[in-house]
Amino acid sequence: MTIIRSILQSIFLLAATQTIAAGHNSMITYQIGDNEYKAFVAEPESMASTTVYIIHDWNGLNDYEISRAKMLAEQGYRAVALDLFGVDAKLDGFDDYRRETGKLYNDRSE
């Protein structure tokens, strides 16, 4: 199973079972194998009927994705900004971005 598929399955399960109060935001963590990942969940003020998943750019989950999740929650959506690299990923520049993105590209099924 690919990393991305495992992450998506885990986050869909978390999104279905994680209880976060309406109008609140929370950084959650989850485990796949030996790796720990995080996701930022932004809940709207009223019950959301739709969840939007935000996939980060090659520089990882950061303030940009978090701000977009909050904006979507203000529009009435439950927004989940995913981390595809894991909490231990070191992202200090282009070489790091290339390395972590390469891991995802090399982990795809044919």
Regions found by a protein language model. Give the residues of each.
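N-terminal signal peptide c-region/cleavage motif recognized by signal peptidases
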Residues: 16-18
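Serine-hydrolase catalytic machinery in alpha/beta-hydrolase-like enzymes
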Residues: 27-110
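Bacterial N-terminal signal peptides that target proteins for export
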Residues: 1-8
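Boundary of Sec targeting at the N-terminus
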Residues: 22-24
